[in-house]
Regions:
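Active-site HxH/HxHxD metal-binding segment of metal-dependent hydrolases
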Residues: 12, 23-26, 33-108, 190-194, ...
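Active-site neighborhood of phospho(di)ester-bond hydrolases with catalytic His/Asp-centered motifs
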Residues: 28-29, 50-58, 76-81, 111-114, ...
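Metallo-beta-lactamase
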Residues: 116-215
């Protein structure tokens, strides 16, 4: 699978155009970037855009979804089954560990609540990469300051799901907040105390300490 990252949006957002090399069928991870450059890439690579994958429904990750569906009315919108947002008749409700096809490629859905209840990550086992939205960034997790956020859920999502993936899995996050756009899980663990905790209580302390630094 090929991956092209696009940086912009509300706050260093990252959208990704992905496609199956064998079929030229493409998808977009998060509609968070103004679409002109993405459309140019679709045209220049002779791609057929089939799906948009939504990592969660915070406004900045779906801001340009209407622009995409205006251009491609047949688009299938793929998001978590219990999301409060239902975008179009083409909305596909995803379940935990469901497998989606994109051409000949297979993508596994991982429900990863914590930052937001409908957060999901999209893992391609063959390519050894995962799109983590706002669940995991380079160097830290997503924040849990919203009324629907939950530290305990985020701990489970990180330690029982993402950190159980192969250590050489490359993460592609929803924002460019780190020293580079993507790293392996192994590297992320080595550089961040968020991913070195031995218990949920320790993880929550790390989260609270981080928020304290934001206030100072």
């Amino acid at each position: 699978m090929q991956i092209k990252a696009f940086l912009g949006g509300y706050d260093k957002n990252l959208s990704y155009l992905i496609w199956c090399e064998a079929t030229r069928i493409a998808g977009i991870i998060d509609a968070s970037i103004e679409i002109t450059e993405i459309l140019e890439c679709i045209d220049s690579n002779n791609l057929l855009l089939e799906k948009v994958f939504i990592t969660h429904t915070h406004f900045d990750h779906i801001k340009y979804l209407d622009d995409l569906t205006d251009q491609f009315p047949y688009l299938q919108i793929c998001g978590y089954k219990n999301s409060e947002e239902k975008f179009t008749d083409n909305y596909r409700e995803l379940d935990h560990h469901e497998i989606i096809t994109l051409g000949t490629e297979m993508i596994t859905v991982l429900h990863t609540p914590g930052h937001y209840p409908d957060s999901v990550c999209f893992w391609n086992k063959k390519g050894n990469f995962v799109f983590t939205g706002d669940t995991m960034f380079v160097g830290r997790t997503g924040r849990t300051i919203g009324p629907k956020s939950n530290n305990s859920c985020l701990y489970s999502s990180i330690y029982d799901e993402l950190l159980k993936l192969p250590q050489q899995t490359v993460i592609y996050p929803g924002h460019h907040y780190g020293y580079k756009k993507s790293v392996t899980l192994k590297e992320n663990i080595s550089l961040s105390p968020f991913f070195q905790c031995n218990s949920e209580d320790e993880f929550i302390r790390v989260m609270e300490d981080y928020e304290e630094t934001r206030r100072n």
